Amino acid sequence: MVEVLLSGIVLGLVPVTITGLFVAAYLQYRRGNQFGL
């Protein structure tokens, strides 16, 4: 039962983590372009 709960947590966190990293990289890219880097 613990394995099912753990796999559910992992499956829920992975897309959120990937999305967060993508958004952070995108914002950093946008900010870098504004300063002409």
UniProtKB/Swiss-Prot annotation:
It comes from Emiliania huxleyi. The gene is petG. InterPro entries: Cyt_6/f_cplx_su5, Cyt_6/f_cplx_su5_sf. Disulfide bonds: none annotated. The keyword Plastid applies. The 4 large subunits of the cytochrome b6-f complex are cytochrome b6, subunit IV (17 kDa polypeptide, PetD), cytochrome f and the Rieske protein, while the 4 small subunits are PetG, PetL, PetM and PetN. The complex functions as a dimer. The lineage of its organism: Eukaryota, Haptista, Haptophyta, Prymnesiophyceae, Isochrysidales. One of its GO terms (molecular function) is electron transporter, transferring electrons within cytochrome b6/f complex of photosystem II activity. Component of the cytochrome b6-f complex, which mediates electron transfer between photosystem II (PSII) and photosystem I (PSI), cyclic electron flow around PSI, and state transitions. PetG is required for either the stability or assembly of the cytochrome b6-f complex. It is found in: Plastid, Chloroplast thylakoid membrane. Keywords: Chloroplast, Electron transport, Membrane, Photosynthesis, Plastid, Thylakoid, Transmembrane, Transmembrane helix, Transport. It is a single-pass membrane protein. NCBIfam families: PRK00665.1 (NF001907). The chain crosses the membrane at residues 5-25. GO terms for cellular component: chloroplast thylakoid membrane; cytochrome b6f complex. Pfam families: PetG. This is Cytochrome b6-f complex subunit 5. It comes from the Eukaryota.
